Regions:
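Bacterial N-terminal signal peptides that target proteins for export
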Residues: 2-14
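N-terminal, post-signal-peptide region of Sec/Tat-exported proteins
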Residues: 49-85
Length: 254
């Protein structure tokens, strides 16, 4: 009888150990579901936001402020507010086309082809980065490849592989907050596997029921003389009314 009681205890201990071992696996949702949750936080039908972009060089830094109106991932209108040198510069995105108006020359130019890879006002962001605002679920396949702690937050590490051809980055690696479903770190890679850019997200706040990082620090790994670019959203409103007239070339000169 004693042996039988001991066997039961051992079996219970094994079952408990097994259940504890598989618990983390059960708590991890599929990679596609994680991407969907990220999209729900970061994407919206439309949004209006004010931001500051601080470009850090080896000798000095400069800050540019702007206001952006965006509808989905196809249309956006940005007006730069300061400093005086950039004030009045406007950027219009319609589908796959991008125009920039310069008040100093009173000219509107279209940015296309290889020009899209150029830096935006000397920052670590390219025009391609500003153009592509599609949902991650529409453009990448995902796989959970590990876990790591970032800034005291438990994260899943997601490996993203492009599933459409027209991507600036063939693959990405995301460190996703396991509780809030927002990326806290990201690495962007070329088709060759070379690391092109790295970004870190912080100041995550809840806005209108969604978690959103208000600050992103970008680093172009190939850009010489750059100490990185900080992008901070100072005010944002989701799903608000936006005047239709903004999304026309005529609005650039108004």
């Amino acid at each position: 009888m004693k042996h039988k009681g001991l066997e039961i205890k051992i079996k219970r201990a094994i079952i408990l150990l097994f259940a504890t071992a598989v618990l983390p696996l059960q708590a991890q949702p599929p990679a596609d579901e994680i991407l969907e949750r990220i999209d729900r936080n970061l994407s919206s039908e439309n949004r209006v936001f004010e931001s500051s972009m601080t470009i850090h060089g080896r000798r000095n830094s400069r800050t540019i402020t702007s206001k952006t109106y965006a509808v989905g991932d196809k249309r956006s209108f940005t007006e730069y507010l300061s400093p005086p040198r950039e004030e009045g510069t406007k950027m219009l995105k319609l589908e796959e086309q991008l125009w920039i108006y310069s008040p100093s020359t009173d000219r509107t130019i279209q940015i296309s082809g290889h020009m899209l890879r150029q830096s935006v006002m000397g920052s670590d962001l390219s025009y391609e980065d500003m153009m592509d605002d599609r949902k991650l679920t529409e453009t990448y396949n995902a796989e959970v490849v590990g876990t790591e702690e970032i800034g005291g937050r438990d994260c899943w590490i997601l490996q993203l592989t492009g599933k459409v051809d027209d991507l600036a980055y063939a693959s990405r690696r995301l460190w996703v907050d396991r509780e809030r479903y927002v990326p806290l770190k990201e690495e962007l890679f070329a088709k060759s596997g070379k690391l092109l850019k790295r970004s870190e997200m912080s100041d995550v706040v809840q806005i209108e029921g969604r978690w959103f990082p208000r600050t992103v620090f970008y680093k172009d790994m190939l850009k010489q003389g750059s100490e990185g670019t900080g992008f901070r959203i100072t005010d944002i409103r989701f799903n608000t009314d936006i005047p239709e007239y903004l999304f026309s070339k005529a609005a650039l000169k108004q």
